[in-house]
């Protein structure tokens, strides 16, 4: 009986040591924090919630005196690294963000090699790419105004072709925000409709 208790105690101790080792290993992994990514991507005062891609997740980075986010598929041929958000824009408002890219230069109007693209509801809106080898394009501010108010599925993706890696090989994104004041809607006024009757009461106030 004593021998059984001893082996049981040893087994429990070994299990606890194993669990502790697994937890420690997990804590040391570089797991991106959504709150940190949101803070890096949003402009001051903006509260957009972003979803990070699982294959090549975006990362928080300090660059050019700002805290921003960069794509995570550097050196991965035929890959895409995307970050997305559901954004509601009212009438009179627009979406604004800063973006930059440092990758393989693209030449020609129709060539799309390594580039950072902005997509809304599955439609390519605009994209940027490097124009010189090992030289970032530089930060640019882009503003998009929808045709009508609504909630839109937005995505920023750094897409790579099958060959050539240049520079930092990534796209950068920062200062995402909905800007502008919502349009004011005039309050409806009641107007007499045809066929309605109105009664006027007269009262004699003379002494």
Give short role names for the model-derived ranges:
Residues 123-149:
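Extracellular carbohydrate recognition and processing domains
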């Amino acid at each position: 009986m004593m021998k059984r208790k001893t082996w049981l105690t040893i087994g429990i101790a070994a299990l606890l040591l194993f669990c502790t080792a697994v937890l420690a290993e997990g804590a040391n992994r570089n797991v991106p924090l959504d709150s940190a990514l949101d803070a890096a991507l949003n402009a001051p005062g903006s509260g957009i919630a972003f979803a990070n891609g699982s294959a090549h997740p975006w990362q928080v980075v300090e660059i050019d005196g700002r805290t921003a986010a960069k794509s995570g598929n550097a050196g991965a041929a035929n890959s895409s690294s995307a970050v997305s958000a559901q954004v509601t824009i009212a009438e009179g408002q627009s979406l604004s963000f800063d973006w930059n890219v440092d990758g393989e230069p693209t030449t020609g109007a129709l060539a799309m090699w390594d580039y950072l693209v902005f997509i809304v509801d599955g439609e390519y809106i605009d994209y940027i790419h490097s124009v010189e080898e090992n030289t970032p394009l530089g930060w640019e501010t882009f503003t998009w105004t929808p045709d009508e108010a609504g909630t839109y599925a937005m995505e920023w993706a750094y897409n790579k072709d099958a060959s050539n890696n240049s520079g930092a090989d990534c796209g950068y994104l920062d200062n995402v925000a909905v800007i502008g004041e919502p349009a004011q809607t005039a309050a409806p006024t009641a107007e007499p409709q045809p066929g309605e009757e109105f009664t006027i009461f007269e009262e004699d106030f003379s002494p």
